[in-house]
A protein has these predicted regions:
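Conserved glycine-rich Rossmann-like NAD(P)H-binding loop of the short-chain dehydrogenase/reductase
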Residues: 53
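Asp-based, Mg2+/Mn2+-dependent phosphohydrolase catalytic module
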Residues: 1-23, 28-50, 59-80, 90-300
Length: 300
């Protein structure tokens, strides 16, 4: 069924208790708000008693670091309302009672390290392996830590061959070693005219060398939907997922049984939404989240 354009913001707002917002392409793009109406939109929803949750597949920062970004942009958001895929990796390991005497090898940035250590896990890799190299000489044998019980892979601007090989050895040679991906996002945007390789490209490299599918903890996996619903005591049918990507945000909402609202302020254009090649259709779409302010104008 084709998506309908948002015409009655009031009806949508009244139909749910909670709004889950993606961040990049919805709240901000880079280091700027999507538009000046974002703060007022969030304030309006709060004034109507709606719970707000912010969920990003970007694993480069911790929840605390994202809290700082929200404040820098002039938005009042509690850290308990923020959920990143770096946090999701730690939450997943806690949910399966990952042994604290085992270690986690991280291919990713400090956001993952921070969240894992905050949860009490021992970490290797991450930024400390950014400059490491391997000399591929005949007979070379690479040592790796046999106590690594999980490899967590996220977006990594300092991705290199050393990390690929170390992670591969852990997954292939350490019995029961888990392969966890924060997301499989293919691309992201910085300037609106170019697409940049996302964390899925790093995950793909490890998948290619290990021939093992990862456990994905970010969108569109339902792990964080289940986690958030349990944490706040929410029925998923009372949630509206708001995002700019069809194959992560909207699919995440659909997989979780939520209402879905696509905004055209990020990766997905109207042409992409309407394309006959697109098989993911949100319940509603609109240009940006400040279109929800139409309810305010209508009641003045």
């Amino acid at each position: 069924m084709a998506a309908a354009k948002l015409e009655d913001a009031d009806a949508l707002i009244d139909s749910v208790e909670t709004f889950i917002f993606d961040c990049d392409g919805v709240i901000w793009k880079g280091d700027k708000l999507i538009d000046d109406g974002v703060p007022e939109t969030l304030d309006l929803l709060r004034s109507k008693g709606k719970r707000l949750v912010f969920l990003t597949n970007n694993s480069t920062r911790s929840r605390k670091q994202y809290g700082s970004k929200f404040r820098t942009l002039g938005l009042t958001v509690d850290e308990e309302e923020i959920f990143s895929s770096s946090f999701a990796a730690a939450a997943y390991l806690q949910s399966i009672h990952f042994p604290k005497d085992k270690k986690v090898y991280v291919i990713g940035e400090e956001g993952i390290i921070n969240e894992l250590e905050l949860a009490g896990f021992q970490c290797l890799g991450g930024p400390s392996d950014a400059d490491k190299k391997i000399e591929l000489t005949p007979g070379f044998y690479m040592e790796h830590d046999k106590d690594v019980g999980a490899v967590v892979v996220g977006f990594d601007r300092y991705f290199n061959y050393y990390k690929v090989q170390y992670g591969t050895l852990c997954i292939r040679e350490n019995p029961g070693c888990l392969f966890i991906a924060t997301s499989r996002d293919t691309v992201f945007q910085l300037n609106g005219v170019q697409e940049w390789a996302g964390g899925g490209s790093m995950v793909g490299a490890i998948l290619g060398s290990t021939k093992q599918e990862p456990v994905v903890v970010g969108k569109p996996s339902t792990f964080m939907m289940d986690y958030i619903a349990k944490k706040f005591g929410i029925t998923t049918s009372q949630i509206c997922m708001v995002g700019d990507m069809l194959d992560t945000d909207i699919l995440f909402g659909q997989n979780g049984g939520c209402k879905t609202l696509l905004v055209l302020s990020g990766v997905t254009s109207h042409e992409m939404l309407q394309s006959h090649n697109n098989s993911i259709h949100p319940d509603l779409y609109t240009n940006q989240i400040s279109d929800l302010l139409a309810v305010k104008a209508a009641t003045v």
